[in-house]
Amino acid sequence: MADDWESAADSEVVIRPNATNNINKWEGEDDDEDVKESWEDEEEKKDEEKPTKADVPVKTKPNKALKAKLEEQARLEEEEEANRLANLTPEEKLAEKLRLQKIQEESDLKHALDAFGVTSTGGGGLDAFNPESKEEFKEFGASLSWKIAQYKESPHFPQFVEDLVRGLCVNLSATDIKKVKINVETLHSEKLKMEKANAKKPAGKGKGKATLRTENDDIDGYKKYGNDFTDDYDDFM
């Protein structure tokens, strides 16, 4: 009977496998790694999408020593020019005045050519002028004078100017011709004084030199004829 109980006990004993043995303790960690990697990728993309700041140019400080040196140089040049003008004789002052006037005329001519779109080397430049007003005729005359003055070194230039003036005056009335004659005579007188002064040897100030009247600024009337008339123009009429 005891054997029957033992056999019965043995038959009822059922060995169940441990359910926990089949559970993967690393399960789910791969998913965590995938999520982590996706976060890192998103962070990298955000960093790449951030706009980079443009390089700000570095402002260079001006060289104070160089600036001061240039200002001092300009001041010395102005003083030197002022001293030079102060030591000029009346004849030299007149020559300087005419020189500056010529520079101003050339500058005015350049502005006039630019205003009319005319170039000094362009073909048919003077044909582009069609003056109507007084100012336009002045600009046209300045342009003609500039063009003609390019040939002043030619030995035929004096005769050419004489013929040109005579031909132009044919179209004027006697009253207007008289005005032209007065202007030419004034120019002749000034030129004669300058040439005589240049022919003299340098001497002490105020010795043997007549003082010229330089307050006569009425030279606009002969601007269009240039500054190179010969001394015998008082007889051309």
UniProtKB/Swiss-Prot annotation:
Family indicated by similarity: Belongs to the eIF-3 subunit J family.
Q: Which organism is it from?
A: Drosophila ananassae
Pfam families tied to this protein: eIF3_subunit
- Self-association and partners: Component of the eukaryotic translation initiation factor 3 (eIF-3) complex. The eIF-3 complex interacts with pix.
* Basic and acidic residues bias (residue ranges): 47-58
Q: Which UniProt keywords apply?
A: Coiled coil, Cytoplasm, Initiation factor, Protein biosynthesis
Keyword Zinc-finger (UniProt):
no
Q: Quick one: where's region Disordered?
A: 1-66
MF terms from GO for this chain are: translation initiation factor activity
Q: What does this protein do?
A: Component of the eukaryotic translation initiation factor 3 (eIF-3) complex, which is involved in protein synthesis of a specialized repertoire of mRNAs and, together with other initiation factors, stimulates binding of mRNA and methionyl-tRNAi to the 40S ribosome. The eIF-3 complex specifically targets and initiates translation of a subset of mRNAs involved in cell proliferation.
Q: Provide the coiled-coil residue spans.
A: 63-112
Q: What is this protein called?
A: Eukaryotic translation initiation factor 3 subunit J
- Asked whether the UniProt record includes Glycosyltransferase among its keywords, one would answer no
Main location (coarse class): cytoplasm
Domain of life (superkingdom) = Eukaryota
Q: Write the signal peptide boundaries.
A: none
